[in-house]
Amino acid sequence: MFSRNFYYRVKYQINKKAIFDVFYQYFANRLKHPFNKNQKKKLKRLHQKYLETKRTSTDYFSINAYYWDLIINKNFKEFSYLEIGSWEGNSASYILKNFKTKKVFCVDVWDTNNDSPKEEERSRFKNFIFNLKEFKERFSFFKGTSDEFFKNNDQKFDVIYVDGWHEANQVYKDIDNSWNCLNVNGIIICDDYFYGDIKNNLVNNLPANAINKFLFENKNKLKVICVNNTQIFFKKITN
């Protein structure tokens, strides 16, 4: 009934000390897959087609378009959005193109130093600006670390996407800081929950370690609402 990768992911969750709700939502998501897989493919293809007009070196987002569409539309008619780790603006472009937003704020370090040894690193910010230029009046960005952004931030948000530096301590800081500026009933989306060597899961300095730690510490203040093969979504139900 389930693939080998499903069992590897369950083992991964056990190893990373996931709370029960994470197991439950992942299992529920896999049970629904036969019934929604066509819609997943449709939304994935639609966004990939849209990206043909953009400049992207990678696309890790399109596979999750279905979940963003489903969960955001179910919870919000209009919302404010923050993302930590914008890369070339793939996820931000999806938000701006498909939803009614109050504000969209993007945070990334974007290595724009002309002395950078890697041309691709210097081009990411240029790609980000190019990819979002059609929405230039609807978004803002902060060029710097997430720690620097949160230190001076006084804004609140309804949806926050955490996809910054993947070392566990930094992921935890990003989630904790995001939580503090998240409105009640707001949603945090964490990328790369299943990350690294899923089969052997020997490393304990990954996003899942930080995510599970935060979920355990705040389990009475939040609700896990979705776990797919790459991302986890949870809602703030109280301060």
Positions of PLM-derived features:
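Boundary detector for helix-to-coil junctions that initiate low-complexity/charged tails
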Residues: 1-33
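Intrinsic-disorder/low-complexity, polar/charged segments
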Residues: 12-18, 59, 63, 167
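Intrinsic structural disorder/low-complexity segments
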Residues: 7-11, 16, 36, 77, ...
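Class I SAM-dependent methyltransferase Rossmann-like catalytic core
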Residues: 24-77
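N-terminal compositionally biased, intrinsically disordered segments and leader/signal-like regions
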Residues: 6, 57-59, 239
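Arginine residue identity/basic-tract feature
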Residues: 4, 9, 30, 42-45, ...
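S-adenosylmethionine/decaboxylated-SAM
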Residues: 50, 54-55, 65, 69-239
